[in-house]
Amino acid sequence: MKPDIHPAYRTVLFHDTAADAYFLIGSTVDTDRTQQHTDGTTYPYVALDVSSASHPMYTGQQRKTTTEGRIAGFNKRFASFGSGSNKETAATQ
C-alpha cells in the first residue's frame, strides 16, 4: 500500500437533528466541527438530516398503501371503459 493516501479513520459524533439522537461511529468523514459528547470526550461532529432514528422506514411511521385499495381505485377509474358495449352488440347479432 502507498503511504499517506488513505483518509484518517476515527470516531466521529453524528447528530440526527430530526430526532435529536447522537451516534458515535467510526468514519473517514472530514469535518472541522467538534462537539463534546456525554462521556466528556470531544469528537469531530457531523449533523445529519435523517438517520435510522428518524427515517419512517425504521420508525414505523410510514404510510402503507394496501393492495385492496389500489385495485379498487383501478376498477373505479376504468369501470366504464368497456362495460356495456360487448353485451349490447352480442344481443343484437
Swiss-Prot record:
Q: Which organism is it from?
A: Pseudomonas syringae pv. tomato (strain ATCC BAA-871 / DC3000)
Protein name, entry field = Large ribosomal subunit protein bL31B
Fetch the PANTHER family from UniProt: 50S RIBOSOMAL PROTEIN L31, CHLOROPLASTIC, LARGE RIBOSOMAL SUBUNIT PROTEIN BL31C
* InterPro entries, alphabetized: Ribosomal_bL28/bL31-like_sf, Ribosomal_bL31, Ribosomal_bL31_B, Ribosomal_bL31_sf
* A biological-process GO annotation: translation
Task: State the family named in the UniProt similarity comment for this chain.
Answer: Belongs to the bacterial ribosomal protein bL31 family. Type B subfamily.
User: What are the record keywords, sorted?
Assistant: Ribonucleoprotein, Ribosomal protein
Q: What GO CC annotations are associated with the protein?
A: ribonucleoprotein complex; ribosome
Relate the assembly described in the record. Part of the 50S ribosomal subunit.
**Molecular function GO terms recorded:** structural constituent of ribosome
Q: Which SUPFAM superfamilies match?
A: L28p-like (SSF143800)
Q: Lineage, please? A: Bacteria, Pseudomonadati, Pseudomonadota, Gammaproteobacteria, Pseudomonadales
